[in-house]
Each structure stands twice: as structure tokens, then as C-alpha cells.
Curated annotation (Swiss-Prot):
It comes from the Bacteria. Pathway: Pyrimidine metabolism; dTTP biosynthesis. It holds the Pfam family Thymidylat_synt. HAMAP family: Thymidy_synth_bact. Its main location: cytoplasm. The keyword Methyltransferase applies. DUMP binds at R21, R126, R127, R179, S180, S181, D182, N190, H220, A221, Y222. InterPro entries: Thymidate_synth/dCMP_Mease (IPR045097), Thymidate_synth/dCMP_Mease_dom (IPR023451), Thymidate_synth/dCMP_Mease_sf (IPR036926), Thymidylate_synthase (IPR000398). This is Thymidylate synthase. It is an enzyme of class 2 (transferase).
């Protein structure tokens, strides 16, 4: 994806030096956007190999409403381990807000159900979206992620926080807003997960997956990722792979990792980098 490499270069070339919550330091730009037509392939980076199993299983986990890392660990995903309590709890993070947003009368709202239903029954609606930014549960920045989770708060606030759908002539496009985007580690995963979700929703609603748009707020590269970014920028993008979904499950919640196949993924070696905690 040429657009992604251009964004990487933009951040390291034009980014302002800033401090951050983790104490690592970043170079950051504000308010960026790129688009990808899914007819041109599945946006899994080819300039470094990505672990598609982690991307798919994390999305499946979030859609299930689960907020404990036990299932992730059992399915080969470790990306949330640093923020969980000793019992694996993350507090009311993504999945709970997506599928069980609390209401004043003690009930909950499933935003994913709303999105699927509206895509099927009123695809011209301008209200087809879901998000995870529930101010009541945002973490106290003076406390650790584990303390926040124990106190009923989110271990981390949502970074990829708002998803909106747009339907035209039977084609589904999705836009994602990311308030805080780690361009080297996080953004490639978020982009692929958005594309996967678009394919899943399109299949469930008998639509054709069309375009994804990623909009980022604080768009940053950590100071300890600069060498890795230079390595990636020196590589040449290859042809993107294709996504095959092998069956149509009964609902958006019934997909399994084995339902997905990435065909023709030819990527350069992965590039290791430390996560800022």
C-alpha cells in the first residue's frame, strides 16, 4: 500500500517532536486520511509480514463482547497481555461498548445489531455507525491499566473508536476514525481489521465490499521505532493478497478464524519493534 508508506514518510519527515503518556517520545502529525478500494486487494501490508491470525481473532473477540484476554491467549493472540490484570481482565473495553452499551434504565444496546439491521433495512441512512468512546468508563490517567480495570474502568481508552458505513448501488464502504494512531505497529492492524469487518458486514447484508477510509487524529511514530520505519520505507510494495471467506455464517458473531483464507500473500519479513506501554 503506497498510501501507507507515504503516511509513514510524512510522519518521520514532518512530524513534531512530542512527549506522550508512555514517556517514550514521538514524532506526530495531526489529522491524516487514506483510502483503499477493496477491489485492488486485501490491505495486508507487503513491506513487512503481518500476523493475520491476530488481526482476525482480535476482531472476532471484540465482536463477541469479550473483554478478557483468556480467549485471545487460547487462540494465539498476545497483543493485549501487557494491559490486563492477573485475571486477564481489561475492564469495559471495545467489545463491551460495541455490544452492550449501558443505558440509564439498566439495560444495554448492541450497536453491532443496530448496524447490521440498518444496513439491511435502511441502507441510505446516515446514522449507520458504532463507537466505543463511553466517557463514563475512560481510564484515570494517573493509574495503571490494571488498576483502572480493577476499578471498573477501561484499561486503555479506545484508539480506533468510530466506524461508519456508507451504501451506494449495493456497495458497502466503511470509514474508521482513530483518535491516536501508532503508525508503525497499530495502524497496519487497524487497516486490515477494518477491511475484514467490511467484508464480513457486506457478506451478512448481501452487499459488495467497496472502499475503506482510515482517518487518524494524533498520528505518531515512537522515537524507538525510527530505525524500523527506515527499514520499511526502503522496501518496495508488492501485489496485495486476496481475502476468501469460505462460508456465510448465520450472523456477524459466528465467524471463526478458519472461515478466512488469505490468498497470494507475498510479504517481506516482519520487523520487530517494542510496544510503548
Amino acid at each position: 500500500m503506497k498510501q501507507y508508506l507515504e503516511l509513514l514518510n510524512d510522519v518521520v519527515t514532518n512530524g513534531l517532536t512530542k512527549g506522550d503518556r508512555t514517556g517514550t517520545g514521538t514524532k506526530a502529525v495531526f489529522a491524516r486520511q487514506y483510502r483503499h478500494n477493496l477491489a485492488d486487494g486485501f490491505p495486508l501490508l507487503t513491506t513487512k509480514k503481518l500476523h493475520f491470525k491476530s488481526i482476525a481473532n482480535e476482531l472476532i473477540w471484540m465482536l463477541s463482547g469479550n473483554t478478557n484476554i483468556k480467549w485471545l491467549n487460547e487462540n494465539g493472540v498476545k497483543i493485549w497481555d501487557e494491559w490486563a490484570t492477573e485475571d486477564g481482565d481489561l475492564g469495559p473495553v471495545y467489545g463491551e461498548q460495541w455490544t452492550a452499551w449501558p443505558t440509564k434504565d439498566g439495560g444495554t444496546i448492541n450497536q453491532i445489531d443496530y448496524m447490521v439491521h440498518t444496513l439491511k433495512t435502511n441502507p441510505n441512512s446516515r446514522r449507520i455507525l458504532f463507537h466505543g468512546w463511553n466517557v463514563e468508563y475512560l481510564p484515570d490517567e494517573t493509574k495503571s491499566p490494571q488498576e483502572n480495570a480493577r476499578n471498573g474502568k477501561q484499561a486503555l481508552p479506545p484508539c480506533h473508536l468510530l466506524y461508519q458505513a456508507f451504501v451506494h448501488d449495493g456497495h458497502l464502504s466503511m470509514q474508521l476514525y482513530i483518535r491516536s494512531s501508532d503508525v508503525f505497529l497499530g495502524l497496519p492492524y487497524n487497516t486490515a481489521a477494518l477491511a475484514l469487518l467490511t467484508h464480513m458486514l457486506a457478506q451478512q447484508c448481501d452487499l459488495i465490499p467497496h472502499e475503506i477510509i482510515v482517518t487518524t487524529g494524533d498520528t505518531h511514530a515512537y522515537s524507538n521505532h525510527m530505525e524500523q520505519i527506515r527499514t520499511q520505507l526502503a522496501r518496495t510494495p508488492k501485489k496485495l493478497p486476496e481475502l476468501v471467506i469460505k462460508r456465510k455464517p448465520a450472523s456477524i458473531y459466528d465467524y471463526k478464524f478458519e472461515d478466512f483464507e488469505i490468498v497470494g500473500y507475498d510479504a517481506d519479513p516482519s520487523i520487530k519493534a517494542d510496544v510503548a506501554i
